[in-house]
């Protein structure tokens, strides 16, 4: 078990602790929380956990610019040798344990369209789907659907968003198509009632 104080030397909110417990229990997580509330920390925990297990973690975003920014942030945080980047026109350290990419790139991996890899999904502990509200996009939403449907069931899905409106429906759907129980947690924008969580009865 990871020592949380070693990685996060500050008090965590209840919803963050709930999400961390869910990940440690082997569940996937759907987390919708307001911007600035600390939901990115959950993705960082999944990365720390994967590194501690000598496993890989993929961090996906909908935009090349956001992927580039996350790559720079993670390279500063974890070290350049541990972080790679894959977008449509950039490939850096693609065998790194932390691999940042656009969601379309991950979808293509799931369809076996990356022959130059021996097995890019081998030892993949978790995949973080940042800005997962793009699933509701009429033009690109199918990319997220295909990603979740074809993601190996042994791999935890960490879906993060500030704005997804039907998070409970997304939770139920992921439970059906992906396998592991998904834990849905979200925070209220009210500072007096910031934490609200819903755990599936099977958890």
What do the predicted segments below correspond to?
Residues 14-160, 171-173:
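Conserved P-loop/Walker A NTP-binding site and adjacent catalytic elements of P-loop NTPases
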Residues 197-203:
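Hydrophobic alpha-helical segments, chiefly the membrane-spanning helices
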Residues 163:
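Compact soluble domain cores
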Residues 174-184:
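A short helix-turn-beta junction within AAA+ P-loop NTPase domains corresponding to the substrate/partner-engaging
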